[in-house]
Amino acid sequence: MKVTVSHLDEMRFEAKTERGQSFVIDCPVISPIEYFLAGLVACTTSDLIAIPKKQGKTVTGLSVEGDVVRNETAPCKFNTLHLDYRFDSDADDTAALRWVMGSIETYCSTINTVRDTTKITYSVTHNGKLLRENEEIISGQGADVDFGEIDACCSN
């Protein structure tokens, strides 16, 4: 994977991917660290559409909120990350939890990039029912959760 960032003007930059796509980073409107967090949350959110779809299931009303606490002084790295998953589906609660864990433990590249240096917790509300609240991810190494190949945005 390769991305090239070029200065446009003032504090605006253009990011281009090796696949030819581009977007503008407009600091300080949205900071690079906010883009990073948004990318992390988008990665796991896309998994929560792709994994169920592969199993013939449908997810609706999906929302994932990422809340980070960072160092107050440089380097202002992530210390803690909490992910709050809320969605409805035509599957049972066990399947819904497996989808979340599949994303967290295996498929989401961005979560797995920060997991060794960041305390990560998560909550899951499925079909209006709170299934997990502030559960800590303790493995630190990912796990062999295999739903096969999925077509999610972080697969490339």
Predicted regions and their residues:
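Extended beta-strand/beta-hairpin segments
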Residues: M1-A38, I49-N156
